[in-house]
């Protein structure tokens, strides 16, 4: 499927919620569409990535699939608000999400992606704050970032910047 056909199929199936977010569950439920999206996001990163890094929770679904497609490891990043790392030493990064709420990502200090080439994968970029937090976290662990791959993004200056620099692979961009 061409990128244009993929974008059209995606636009036909996506439903925007009342909060402005896209409901991606129908995409994940369509095996052909999901497979085509995973292939599109992985394209160009073959042999260039040791780990795919993705945030909890929906990013994990997509990130694990892209990692499998690339033959790479998967390094999940937890949202610390979920309280998983209660008794571990962690590296934390704090950011403001698209709703202007204070959030934090964290990984154990012995994170498996340390020093490895990584591809950042998420489902959708609203403001770029989550991706910027992932970048900051990866930089703390000396992980060379090979790129960013997402199903979709809202049109913002940071998105344009990443696209112009060739850092972002995105199936769909919305106004």
Model region roles, listed by residue range:
Residues 5-6, 132-175:
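PRPP-dependent phosphoribosyltransferase catalytic core
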Residues 56-61, 127:
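Gly/Ser/Thr-rich loops at beta-strand to alpha-helix junctions
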Residues 122-131:
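Acidic, divalent-metal-coordinating active-site segment for phosphoryl/phosphodiester hydrolysis
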Residues 72-118:
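Short, glycine/charge-rich flexible loops or terminal/linker lids adjacent to PRPP-binding catalytic cores
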Residues 62-71, 134-135:
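Short Gly/Thr/Asp-enriched flexible loops that form oxyanion-binding sites at enzyme active sites
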Residues 50, 116, 146:
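Conserved acidic residues
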